[in-house]
Swiss-Prot record:
GO molecular function: nutrient reservoir activity
Known role: Major seed storage prolamin.
Alphabetically ordered keywords of this record: Seed storage protein, Signal, Storage protein
Protein name as annotated: Kafirin PSK8
Organism: Sorghum bicolor (Sorghum)
Signal sequence range: 1-19
Amino acid sequence: TKIFALLALHALLVSGTTAAIIPQCSLAPNAIIPQFIPPVTALGNEHLAVQAIRLQQVLSASILQQPIAQLQQHFLAHLTVQTITRRRQQQQQQQQQQQQFLSSLSALAVRNQAAYLQQQLLTSNPHSLANAAAYQQQQQLQLAMANPTAYVQQQLLLSNPQAATNAATYLQQQQFQQILPALSQLAMANPTAYLQQQQLLPINQLALANTDAYLQQQQLLPVNPLVVANPLVAAFLQQQQLSSFNQISLVNPALSWQQPIIGGAIF
């Protein structure tokens, strides 16, 4: 019996040193051993299976951590690429908007220089950039205080679409409408003088050929009672003489040369 007991103990010892089974069960003694044995002896007496499991755990942790770091790097690189492309797109859009704005400004400068200058003043003034409506109102008030006539003309030009397309023609029409009552009174009082005055409204070619005669004709304008009574008539007549073409010189050149004399007789 003693011999069998010794053989059984020997078999247990041999199987304990060579066994590589049940790693979960081997963890419990491994946790208990360091309480009674120093760490060096515990590490030396640790089973090979436990060492293999620990090595496997360390390797698996390192393998799992590497893809996470790589994914983070790829994600950061993707974010940087997206930000760079977004900034480039924003810059391209800003450049396109600037080009469109410059083209519209050039077209506005060709069509309406006054509006172009006002827009340039708005962009150059920081107060106008902060509040363009208040700045425009302030400018309009200053214009109304400095020159009420120009302010009224500007308001009429802004309110009338025909005036926006052709401001000069619109102003001439407004001036003509203002002097229509005076002209109608002249036509009723003296039809001959009215017809002669209508013939003298276009530009006098003699002013280009003979400046002295034209100046004499202009000096005789204040003698006209109609001009003295209504200064707008004088301004309108002068404007018409300087802005339109004399049809009389085409039909009858002799009458065109006599035109200053007729004007002196009338005025």
